[in-house]
Amino acid sequence: MMKKPVVIGLAVVVLAAVVAGGYWWYQSRQDNGLKLYGNVDIRTVNLSFRVGGRVESLAVDEGDAIKAGQVLGELDHKPYEIALMQVKAGVSVAQAQYDLMLAGYRDEEIAQAAAAVKQAQAAYDYAQNFYNRQQGLWKSRTISANDLENARSSRNQAQATLKSAQDKLRQYRSGNREQDIAQAKASLEQAQAQLAQAELNLQDSTLIAPSDGTLLTRAVEPGTVLNEGGTVFTVSLTRPVWVRAYVDERNLDQAQPGRKVLLYTDGRPDKPYHGQIGFVSPTAEFTPKTVETPDLRTDLVYRLRIVVTDADDALRQGMPVTVQFGNEAGHE
């Protein structure tokens, strides 16, 4: 009769050992794998107008959620609209000049140039004949040297006028020179470039959100006169959300780009976020003071950037995160 309690006692001991062993195995499986500590890293960007001017309106305020493509603010457009009108007029003038160069001269202009040559030729012939007569009179001492010189000057002037008229007629008949056409084309292209710049300036007097995010600061108010590039808003980008962590050389082989990990925060200790290693620094550095593990603080470590694939609004800049490696994380 005494054997039965002994058997029961042995069974209890064995059962307790099995339970303890199972618990130990479960805990070892839970703790198996590398564990790192890091912080949430959300990028911020300063938004500004590329051009300067007076702030006409701002459409958002601090704390507002913004969407990519949303209009955030506008400068006074009037100066840029006037500048655009001016350069458009310049393009029209340059285009007309270029077209004129390509078209050459009209028949009426050529006819007028030919008539001018005939007139200049007649004037030259008369001046030449008069000079010849004056030479004869000079030889007979009938006129003074001054009279002969005046006749020569008149002949030379008529000759120059004739040559100018002939050159003009030749140009009209052959059309504009290639160099003149090229110069007119270059002037047109310069005017078109100024037009493109004026259109861009007008476009950039409206501030557009480049991506989704949350407005952190609003640095100016309507009526402020800004220089180009002056900060108007600071925005926290919604995506991507990263975790910055550090790994020592001993465990570096486990932290390869593409490796999936689990990310735990104090607010969600039982419901991890999912992440994937996107970048591993190629150079070692001393561990930053923010790293919570004392045994790493004096080591050389490598920086990791882990992309949170299921991030939500609960993740905030600088929030501490535990990075859990393991078979479950690596093969999800």
UniProtKB/Swiss-Prot annotation:
SUPFAM superfamilies membership: HlyD-like secretion proteins, Outer membrane efflux proteins (OEP)
Keywords: Coiled coil, Periplasm, Signal
Organism: Shigella boydii serotype 4 (strain Sb227)
Keyword Nucleotide-binding: no
Lineage of producing organism: Bacteria, Pseudomonadati, Pseudomonadota, Gammaproteobacteria, Enterobacterales
InterPro entries: CusB_D23, UPF0194_membrane_YbhG, UPF0194_transport
Signal peptide, first to last residue: 1-16
One GO CC annotation: periplasmic space
Subcellular location: Periplasm
Identification of the protein by name: UPF0194 membrane protein YbhG
Major subcellular site: periplasm
PANTHER family for the chain: EFFLUX SYSTEM COMPONENT YKNX-RELATED (PTHR32347), UPF0194 MEMBRANE PROTEIN YBHG (PTHR32347:SF29)
Alphabetized HAMAP family for the sequence: UPF0194
Protein family membership: Belongs to the UPF0194 family.
Coiled-coil residues: 108-209
Top-level lineage group: Bacteria
